[in-house]
Amino acid sequence: MLTSLDYYRVFYYVAKHRSFTRAAEVLTTSQPTVTRTVKNLENDLGCRLFERDRRGVVLTAEGELLY
């Protein structure tokens, strides 16, 4: 599947703000949409881009390379 540039845009804002919620606010969309988009990108690339916890997100080694 060809990954949309919008996926990378969402990834960029999540990585920049270290938060799905803050990225959603900046992108004026919902947090579930941001989460789903990142999940789709991770599935397309075949790797995890973020480690998630209740305090936010941290880039994985693969995420660092993409960022």
Over which residues does each language-model region extend?
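C-terminal effector-binding regulatory domain of bacterial HTH transcription factors
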Residues: 1
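Sequence-pattern detector for short linear motifs
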Residues: 12, 25, 39, 55-57
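Short helix-boundary/capping micro-motifs
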Residues: 12-30
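A short LG(V/I)-centered, amphipathic sequence patch enriched
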Residues: 20, 42-59, 64
